[in-house]
């Protein structure tokens, strides 16, 4: 199972939000590339980058920071946030991004997901973010009335092989990851699932591994010193 550290970007800086609230922002690093290099040294092989400004705007905003992260040797990069057109997807892949994570597009533009999967096979993933069972889009700011399993089935049919599932209500709160919910989603939709949101300790890594998930994304727990990435990587491989 893969442990995937997260880098969230606002204004070119590494930040974390509490429950996805842009008003509750903590800046953890001014230099995203330096932070990425540190994560690679600690064992990261894939880094989950989210352009939070892009998620709100509807197009990629932090491209300079993304380019700098991609230039760090030793880890692949997946990017989400504001990727809602084929030219923008192509642009970030040309910057060196390995995988794109489509969230809002997975709900509003299933045709785009199909086109992207056909044009860039194996490089398109879907981010499904839910609060109280309802999928949220546009940087978690808008409800959809849809359930996670329904969206996961749709993107699977469009060609997506892996879904990253975030419980927005747990994100940044250290309440424990929803490994059981992610495992249910994996079984119901028949697609690989990476869990995210609420990771607080190595027990969460163990729970995701025991649930048979493809991976777990770790963010604030790393930045607040609750988990050492090297320990998490070791635990996932046990």
Curated annotation (Swiss-Prot):
It comes from the Bacteria. It is found in: Cytoplasm. It is an enzyme of class 5 (isomerase). NCBIfam families: 1-(5-phosphoribosyl)-5-[(5-phosphoribosylamino)methylideneamino]imidazole-4-carboxamide isomerase. Gene3D superfamilies: Aldolase class I (3.20.20.70). The keyword Ion transport does not apply. Keywords: Amino-acid biosynthesis, Cytoplasm, Histidine biosynthesis, Isomerase. This is 1-(5-phosphoribosyl)-5-[(5-phosphoribosylamino)methylideneamino] imidazole-4-carboxamide isomerase. Its main location: cytoplasm. The keyword Isomerase applies. It catalyses: 1-(5-phospho-beta-D-ribosyl)-5-[(5-phospho-beta-D-ribosylamino)methylideneamino]imidazole-4-carboxamide = 5-[(5-phospho-1-deoxy-D-ribulos-1-ylimino)methylamino]-1-(5-phospho-beta-D-ribosyl)imidazole-4-carboxamide. Belongs to the HisA/HisF family.
């Amino acid at each position: 199972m893969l442990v995937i550290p997260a880098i969230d970007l606002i204004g070119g800086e590494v930040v974390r939000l509490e429950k996805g609230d842009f008003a509750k922002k903590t800046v953890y690093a001014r230099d995203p590339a330096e932070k990425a290099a540190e994560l690679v040294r600690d064992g990261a092989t894939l880094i989950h980058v989210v352009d939070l400004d892009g998620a709100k705007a509807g197009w990629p905003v932090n491209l300079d920071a993304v380019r700098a992260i991609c230039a760090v040797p030793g880890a692949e990069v997946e990017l989400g946030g504001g990727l809602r057109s084929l030219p923008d997807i192509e642009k970030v892949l040309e910057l060196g991004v390995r995988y794109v994570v489509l969230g809002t597009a997975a709900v509003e533009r299933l045709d785009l997901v199909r086109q992207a999967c056909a044009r860039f096979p194996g490089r398109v993933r879907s981010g499904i973010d839910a609060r109280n069972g309802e999928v949220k889009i546009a940087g978690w700011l808008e409800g959809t009335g849809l359930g996670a399993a329904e969206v996961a089935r749709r993107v699977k049919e469009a060609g997506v092989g892996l879904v990253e599932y975030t419980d927005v209500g747990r994100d940044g709160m250290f309440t424990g990851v929803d490994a059981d919910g992610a495992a249910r989603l994996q079984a119901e939709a028949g697609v690989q699932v990476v869990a995210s949101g609420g990771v607080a300790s190595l027990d969460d890594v163990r729970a995701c591994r025991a649930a048979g998930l493809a991976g777990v994304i770790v963010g604030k727990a790393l930045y607040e010193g609750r988990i050492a990435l090297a320990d998490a990587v070791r635990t996932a491989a046990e």
